[in-house]
Amino acid sequence: MSEQTCVIFAAGEYYGDTPIVPSGALVIAADGGLDHTRALGIEADFVIGDFDSLTSSVPHGSNTLRLPSQKDDPDLLSALKVGWNRGARQFRIYGALGGRIDHTIASIQLTALLAQHGGVGFLYGDGMIVTAVSDARLDFAARHVDSTGDARARMVSVFAHSSDAQGVSERGLKYELTDATLTNTIVQGVSNELLDERAASIDVRQGTLIVTFPSSESLPRITRHHAFTGDLGALDTTVSSALAV
């Protein structure tokens, strides 16, 4: 059974790409992401944010969720919660990479949060997609790969997000790995490569991995090793006592 898809437009870089919205997908514009949906002629089902990065007018209506500027949850997490609470488990996220490095790191952290709750987020960057996988396997379909062209069109990198990731196997790539343990302080999985007309997989038995792959690839199929419970929580518009000034 296919997962409900949510496409989120954030306020970061789009690298000249035209986002693709699958039929039936939920569309959420997060703050300045509304500038992009308007420019593309895409109707957002929900608009959310404190609107500090929006350059056009703030819409009014029941589908606009205005957040305070001081809060614990960043706008992207709030958008993810809205999508999750409406049944989405696959999130395609544009404009969440590039620009401020702290925003980029936060976006990558949020893909790990999704993975650890049984969802998946794909962050679209400059010719690359970033995702996270937790206790699961990613399967990439075989396709033609040009071994002499731009290396980014075949590059795959794998990082441990959890303190350690156990039972990591990489199959069908230029450099294979079997039942290894990766840690988040030793970088061993950078710059692997997809091979021509060869299916590939990245598997982690226990732990969370961050994976980057070419945006020209079809999105991988995900097989989870167990059921996941819990959710992302309710929309939070408060500042915790630990952060209060």
Task: Outline where the language-model segments fall.
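Short beta-strand segments
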Residues: 8-10, 31, 94-96, 124-125, ...
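General beta-strand structural signal in soluble alpha/beta enzymes
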Residues: 9, 28-30, 49, 65-66, ...
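Structural motif
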Residues: 9-13, 97, 213-215
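Short phosphate-binding loop-to-helix
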Residues: 64-85
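Anionic-ligand-binding alpha/beta catalytic cores of soluble enzymes and soluble regulatory domains
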Residues: 92-141
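Long, charged alpha-helical interface segments
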Residues: 133-245
